Amino acid sequence: MQDLIKAAMAARAKAHAPYSKFYVGAAMRDEHGQVHAGCNIENAAYPQGWCAECSAIAHLVMSGATRVTEVAVLGNGDVLCTPCGGCRQKIREFAAGDVKIHCCTEVGVLLKSFTLDELLPASFGPENLK
């Protein structure tokens, strides 16, 4: 888990959040054990920005991976920063319900871990479209 947290911290340092000043880093482990990180990228046209989890997923997909097996997320200060609803659904596309999502302080101290099912109960996923 420490490698995920370190990657999320490094990604957070690159976040582009000039409007909200809320800097987020996320890192995800894929099915091969590789770590993919992302940061939030705000835009003056607010809804057009990217969440950190979204940019980490993009990195994971571009590498050829198809599964998320573990996640770390950290935001500002000591505030619990969980993925937003949209990112929970995006993670769901690539992860099983028992995947752990570790929420940390900006300096990497673990605050709480959740399963994806805890954050997104009774979710809709790819199997619903078969």
Regions found by a protein language model. Name each.
Residues H32-N43, R67-V71:
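Glycine/charged-rich beta-loop-alpha catalytic/anionic-binding loops adjacent to active sites
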Residues K21-D30:
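Short beta-strand scaffold segments in enzyme catalytic cores
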Residues C51-V71:
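Short, solvent-exposed cationic patches
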Residues L4-A7, A11, F22, Q34, ...:
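Generic hydrophobic secondary-structure packing signal
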Residues C39-C54:
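Compact, glycine-rich, soluble single-domain proteins
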Residues D30-H32, E106-V107:
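Short acidic-glycine loop/turn motifs at beta-strand connectors
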Residues M1-A17, T66-K130:
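C-terminal binding/interaction regions
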